[in-house]
């Protein structure tokens, strides 16, 4: 939060017409996105969804590993967007549409959809490996949107949830 506010104070004396809202909006969007993604994974009642480590070490480890990897996936996707956004702006972008292409246009170099360096695919692979290694079978460990799924099907579902939340975070942060 402090870094965002400090950067905004230094760099955004006169905010641009597109691609930026405010430090407060950016911080709120990031925090809400993380809360929403956690609810997507564990459902609305986090208290009953979390598996305690004392009675069920394996279930607890499964949830912790997957949550950590899902958060890494969100970070990788957001980092790809930010890098693409910087390149597009440096290239003279004059509209929010050009920034939107950094999310879903695989023809835009560096976009999330492009994943030219394979960082997103690598993290999705790590997610699937973690599910197989730490959560076999996951059972009721993830009672949210992807409930009752396992293996790569669970991984694909979690990846879709991350993609959705990352897009919502970007839309809120950048007003696009």
PLM segments and residue spans:
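Soluble, non-transmembrane alpha-helical interaction regions
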Residues: 1-176
């Amino acid at each position: 939060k402090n870094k965002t506010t400090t950067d905004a104070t230094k760099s955004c004396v006169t905010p641009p017409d597109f691609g930026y809202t405010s430090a407060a909006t950016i911080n709120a969007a990031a925090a809400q996105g993380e809360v929403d993604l956690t609810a997507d994974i564990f459902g609305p009642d986090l208290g009953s969804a979390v598996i305690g480590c004392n009675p069920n070490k394996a279930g607890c480890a499964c949830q912790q590993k997957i949550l950590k990897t899902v958060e890494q996936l969100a970070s990788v996707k957001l980092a790809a967007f930010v890098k693409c956004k910087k390149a597009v702006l440096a290239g003279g972008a004059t509209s929010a549409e050009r920034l939107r292409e950094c999310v879903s246009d695989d023809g835009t170099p560096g976009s999330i959809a492009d994943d030219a360096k394979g960082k997103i695919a690598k993290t999705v692979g790590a997610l699937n490996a973690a599910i197989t290694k730490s959560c076999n079978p996951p059972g009721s460990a993830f009672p949210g949107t992807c409930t009752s799924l396992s293996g790569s099907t669970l991984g694909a579902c979690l990846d879709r949830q991350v993609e959705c939340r990352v897009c919502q975070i970007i839309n809120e942060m950048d007003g696009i």
